[in-house]
Amino acid sequence: NVEMLEIDLQITKDGKVIVLHDDSIDRTTNGKGNVIDLSYEEIAEFDAGYNFKDEEGECSFRDQGVIIPLFEEVLKQLPNTYLNIELKGNNPQLVEKVQLLITNYNAEDKILIGSANYFQNKRVHKHLPNCGYYLSRPDLYLFLLVGYFGLLKKYWDKFLTVEAPIEYHG
């Protein structure tokens, strides 16, 4: 059991919302290509367990039918699970599709959502006002500045959390 599951969302060429951190499928599957250039049908042909190594260093998930999931499948399979969602990139269609899915599955009260991209985060705030959200990087810097001057209550009353890695390797 977990209290909250953190996932990243991308949008495919055919407008499907998938659960994937990377912009491409190169690292996580036996395929190649950018998510935005591939349909979900094309992505689902590749083995998402191909490169994953278990604790013994074995590729035990290879050839086991593991595919990159649709966000909708996550909402169906885990209806009572709280989700911390990062929207990747700056595609307005991603926000619109995610809004539709979250609304259709009546999941607003179980979602914490945001994007590191400032413009994408503004779309999130506009389209998903009933979800909790976190700050983009530029908002985080402004948050720190405003906090330094003791003005947080005046300027920030809608976000729920700040996500800032203690360590960053990349």
Regions inferred by a protein language model and the residue ranges of each:
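Catalytic domains of carbohydrate-active enzymes, especially glycoside hydrolases
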Residues: 1-11, 155-162
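Short, charged, surface-exposed secondary-structure boundary motifs
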Residues: 29-30, 141-149
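Metal-dependent phosphodiesterase/phospholipase catalytic core, i.e.
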Residues: 21-132, 151-170
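Short catalytic/ligand-binding loop motif for oxyanion handling, primarily in non-cytosolic enzymes
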Residues: 14, 94, 121-122, 142-144
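Paired acidic/hydrophobic, glycine-rich loop segments that form the ligand-binding mouth/hinge
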Residues: 5, 132-134
